[in-house]
Amino acid sequence: MGVLKTCVLRRSACAAACFWRRTVIPKPPFRGISTTSARSTVMPAWVIDKYGKNEVLRFTQNMMLPIIHYPNEVIIKVHAASVNPIDVNMRSGYGATALNMKRDPLHMKTKGEEFPLTLGRDVSGVVMECGLDVKYFQPGDEVWAAVPPWKQGTLSEFVVVSGNEVSHKPKSLTHTQAASLPYVALTAWSAINKVGGLSDKNCKGKRALILGASGGVGTFAIQVMKAWGAHVTAVCSKDASELVRKLGADEVIDYTLGSVEEQLKSLKLFDFILDNVGGSTETWALNFLKKWSGATYVTLVTPFLLNMDRLGVADGMLQTGVTVGTKALKHLWQGVHYRWAFFMASGPYLDEIAELVDAGKIRPVIERTFPFSEVPEAFLKVERGHARGKTVVNVV
């Protein structure tokens, strides 16, 4: 009981921290949830019962309806969701050690208790039910959100999320368009703003390099940095060059023409580098930062989850700490900053992003949409890589 009380207080505190977001909405006298049946306790969803290849995806009509456990939670009827690379990786078991620890920090559950597991991180839909402490939303509100990977996902009829992870959907977007943005937008926002320290107040005139510019994170990063006045160089393949130029990239490097490192030598140095590629890129990318000027390299490709899968929680966290600390110190001595960034679920950040969207400064980039019946095909599309925007699933 003490643990439950502590969790409730913590979540309530998180919700209270966002009090400045909007005008508080008076609570309606009655809140009811609409489902496919007045007596229904189950819903349709795509789930996995074990980790593996695409064959583990299973459609069910009998997934339990989500319920509100904490007073700051809301239930959303999903109109559209999307598939991200993290979903494909999670389907295969990537990050299971760390995510299970987050789901069950006291190790009270037995192995495999996370199943059946629903994947999908993005949601655009309509609020159906609100917890008692939710003051910024009411049933009927159109909202969007990105669900943390340790929670049940959005490839289902309904999903429950914390109120501080939800934002009102941009008025200018349909649900299909809105579902393409939250996860990649918050990931890019984390890297550029929270870790990289850039914003509309200090970004003007800065030179930015985006490695892996044609995917979901890259296409958002181009647009937000251009909205803030930066000069953006994008690295992608030839067939994505037109796309990234239309999004605002000032210069485009085609990695199919040869060594990116060699091509970059003819350009001026950069103030900021966002790496969506990883691998060997960080062995040379930091050489293209301005030395001793606060220039920063931020990578979204880190060994954190892999270390915990391979070494266990304690050793994995120790190895991760040693790795990032060593690299950061090494590059600091060379006059540049080396950082890791991760997705951060945040309704207030989505509020800011929604303002940029409705102002016409950010537009969704959707490569393909799938009906709810073709979720496995959507996973295969994402798994093949070489994305030119997002893959969206229409649930309604």
Swiss-Prot record:
**Compartments it resides in:** Mitochondrion matrix; Mitochondrion outer membrane
Entry GO CC: mitochondrial matrix; mitochondrial outer membrane; mitochondrion
Name the domain of life: Eukaryota
List the Gene3D superfamilies: Medium-chain alcohol dehydrogenases, catalytic domain, NAD(P)-binding Rossmann-like Domain
Enoyl reductase (ER) domain segment(s): 52-393
Tell me if Transferase is a UniProt keyword of this record. no
Please list the GO terms describing molecular function: oxidoreductase activity; zinc ion binding
Alphabetized UniProt keyword annotations: Membrane, Mitochondrion, Mitochondrion outer membrane, NADP, Neurogenesis, Nucleotide-binding, Oxidoreductase, Transit peptide, Ubiquinone biosynthesis
Q: Hey, what tissues is this thing expressed in?
A: Widely expressed in mitochondria-enriched tissues. Found in heart, kidney, liver, brain and spinal cord.
Q: Report the family membership.
A: Belongs to the zinc-containing alcohol dehydrogenase family. Quinone oxidoreductase subfamily.
Describe its assembly: Interacts with RTN4, UQCRC1 and UQCRC2.
Q: What does this protein do?
A: NAD(P)H oxidoreductase involved in the ubiquinone biosynthetic pathway. Required for the O-methyltransferase activity of COQ3. Able to catalyze the oxidoreduction of 3-demethylubiquinone into 3-demethylubiquinol in vitro. However, it is unclear if 3-demethylubiquinone constitutes a substrate in vivo. May also play a role in the regulation of retinal ganglion cell (RGC) neurite outgrowth, and hence in the development of the inner retina and optic nerve. Appears to be a potent inhibitor of regeneration following spinal cord injury.
| Protein name stated in the entry | NAD(P)H oxidoreductase RTN4IP1, mitochondrial
Source organism (scientific name): Mus musculus (Mouse)
Traced from the root, the source organism's taxonomic lineage reads: Eukaryota, Metazoa, Chordata, Craniata, Vertebrata
